[in-house]
């Protein structure tokens, strides 16, 4: 029996008291858990995104207030979990001040005809933060020749080469030299040796000399005719592809054609094709030190590519995913 009566008093059985205490404890624990979940969600910090744009006059053919501002405004409208700053090459410190870079978790970079104006000091400020895992870098379209992107690809090429020869020449001393492409910002011909490439020769029984040919960061064909492309999701489970259909038509864009002279990416998210048979790996991710770089190909400043909702979804997804790393 749960109750015993003695001299007109009712005594509660100890087991019943324990059950009641356990029930009260569990309800309190559940309430506290819900409180902390709701509180954490309420105070979650937004991902801080710095949109960098070289700003050149031909952007006016498709964008009223610069391409970078268009991206920033549309990303801001996509959700309250993204905080935006839009900066430009002509801003103080080229928009790459310590204040901006220390604030940002992700940089989205648009550059085309003014790539060479970015100073070596600013390239280092960006790439050092990427390598340290303090900043992620998104290169758009013609930013395959952005100086921070090329610096990141050069770093990755050398890292891949060292890992390769450490594996294939265990215990041997290997010294390295690097060779840049024949001329900066030139287009490689079809049939060229794909870069990056690395070779080593034997100096003696214990040491080797290796040569690393750095990546061209370009491709043999391009066609700025505004013809449509089909963007196909190759990694449907990837966070960058969340909420997207399997295939997306880009009504107006410039064509790039493989092979793209870059290190082998860690992930390929999208592939783009054209009616004449060209193809391109149009969404790629590399691990660069402790950080990440994402290259997204569609574009050309004369076409309203970044007014297309799917393109903004991709940039928003990428920013959230990279910012959480």
For the regions a language model picked out, list residue spans one by one.
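A glycine-rich, often tryptophan-bearing local segment used as a flexible ligand/cofactor-contacting loop or short
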Residues: 114-237
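Extracellular ligand-binding/catalytic regions of CAZymes and related secreted enzymes
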Residues: 45-46, 88, 159, 262-268, ...
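Short beta-strand segments enriched in small/hydrophobic residues
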Residues: 46-58
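Helical hinge/lid and interdomain linker segments adjacent to catalytic or ligand-binding clefts
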Residues: 56, 60-153
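Bacterial N-terminal signal peptides
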Residues: 31-39
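Catalytic beta-strand/loop cores that center a nucleophilic Ser/Cys/Thr
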Residues: 78, 82-85, 102-103, 179-289
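Cysteine-centered motifs
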Residues: 15-17
